[in-house]
Design a protein with these regions (language model features):
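Redox-cofactor binding/interface segments in oxidoreductases and associated redox assembly factors
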Residues: 5, 70-71, 90-91
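Glycine- and acidic-residue-enriched helix-capping/strand-helix junction motifs
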Residues: 11-20
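N-terminal beta-loop-helix "entrance" segment that forms/cooperates
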Residues: 34-56
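Short acidic low-complexity segments
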Residues: 54-65
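Alpha-helix boundary/capping motif
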Residues: 146-148
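Short internal beta-strands
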Residues: 4, 25-42
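Glycine/serine-rich phosphate-binding loop and adjoining beta1-alpha1 elements at the start
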Residues: 2, 77, 81-144
Length: 149
């Protein structure tokens, strides 16, 4: 799967959705990773570290145009316009923001809101879960899905 990691654009945001260590793990599973140039700088991860881990360094449009886009924060309207209809978005999407949800629905994405996913062992047993690493934390993705058809 083609996975994109864009630079976070929210003021003061210093996190990145995928570290070079995570790139190695995803690459070992056969995924192709495209990281926007400078995406990890605020989190002390250089473009060179991403390349050494197996990622391609790309521009904003290429990172946002991937099949699966991993972000820390919800995308801005101009970022949504660069995302692939039918693609998947994973991140902290602020599911209580009605306007944001309307924009997501309009973009025709399947979106996983990490802050809405259960973090209990029991929930992980009930609903199949995948683990995504954001920085040094592990978040569980499950049925907290916003799907726009």
């Amino acid at each position: 799967m083609l996975i994109g990691v864009p630079l976070e654009t929210a003021a003061g945001e210093t996190r990145v959705a995928v570290t070079p260590e995570t790139v190695k793990k995803l690459k070992a599973q056969g995924h192709v990773l495209r990281v926007q140039s400078g995406a990890g700088v605020a989190a002390s991860a250089t473009d060179e570290a991403y390349v050494a881990a197996g990622a391609e360094i790309v521009d904003r449009a290429a990172a946002l145009g991937a099949d699966l886009v991993l972000k820390v924060r919800a995308p801005l309207a101009d970022e949504l316009s660069l995302m692939k209809p039918g693609g998947v978005l994973v991140g902290m999407l602020n599911p209580f923001d009605r306007d944001g949800l309307q924009r997501l629905a309009g973009a025709k994405l399947t979106a996983f809101a990490l802050e809405a996913a259960p973090r209990t062992t029991r929930a992980a047993l009930i609903v199949p879960a995948a683990v995504i690493s954001i920085g040094n934390r592990r978040w569980y993705l499950s049925a907290a899905i916003i799907t726009a058809l």
